[in-house]
């Protein structure tokens, strides 16, 4: 059997990953030993390379991904049926800083972006309608329909309404989270102009909400309270939108250094190849971007469980370490407060793709942020303040997490997937496939194929092409989700509904 049929990710690992479906009785050569497979094993799944007694930790990526439920033999297929998570409740952590310097040359790369009055840079120039409450979603959609029909979107990239179900019947922190995300959307540099659309009687009171925007561009962000309109709110809304559109239409792209890029890092529909191909590829890009003075953000906090100490020890200082500890333990408390185990994460699709425990998933997930030091930690709804690698508090849910990344200020999101997904958030959401079969079967979903990494293509060559692709999308090339019209927002609900 050829070595290319398997991969051992870390020298310390007690499993290898199959790069193709393998049959019972086939043999593999690992560390000078010949091992016979004891079961048929799908591609992306794990095979044990040493006997393991019950309770023995099983290592992948050089770290435990759980322990053996029973005694296991070398050659066995390791999956959720014989592997159990080690995760439990909150933990105490010790700061053991790791200072790894990135040895990546700085390049004078640019992209063509829209420089806003406040100095922020957008990769799109769009007109948005942002409802303060779900009650006016229909009005928002109708206004967008009318403006599209009247203008054909000529001279801008898109016109869109970001409908949601919130803005009323919420209390305390839950209500505040909604307000913060909607504020962040209104202030996003991918918007050339925004109509804030209010009903008037909602909990998210329009005047208070507008104060949250701070020192905003009053020419480019306008408010319409529909209950205050005497007559047709559509007619009044169109008057405002025509003016906003006319202003946005005058904006032009210009060369901007890549240091102005803010990129979100996300995975969903992950499989056993995610931590081998797409996530390391995105990690290489993240390191490159940070070395250029740019910014990347990693979220999906529950999918850090089991890999969190790696991130904690990469924090630039003790203050950031403490914030990361709270980031992790606060989310564990969130699970426990609902009576749910912290390790109950891998989905049926994850398991079918070769991910058996949350540690298995987390150690692959965190490959997306490369090796750069952690320079910032953000709470849900916070806007970026620090360049470099940031961590953001948000759940693993694809729609919620991607919206949170964009709300924090990311102009685009890199989304790795092994199973495939069509969705996109309110910024370009590039899909990177972990395997070539997905890229071949779903070219209408996938922007870039990382599966080539297990087919003989060198990482440095693929990273170069990946950088070119991202710069092209940042400069105006449509991501597949944009081409398909798959764009939406989802806000994290964490509280009672009145």
Where do the protein language model's features map onto the residues?
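Metallocofactor- and cofactor-centric catalytic cores in central/energy metabolism, strongly enriched
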Residues: 2-412, 419-422, 427-498
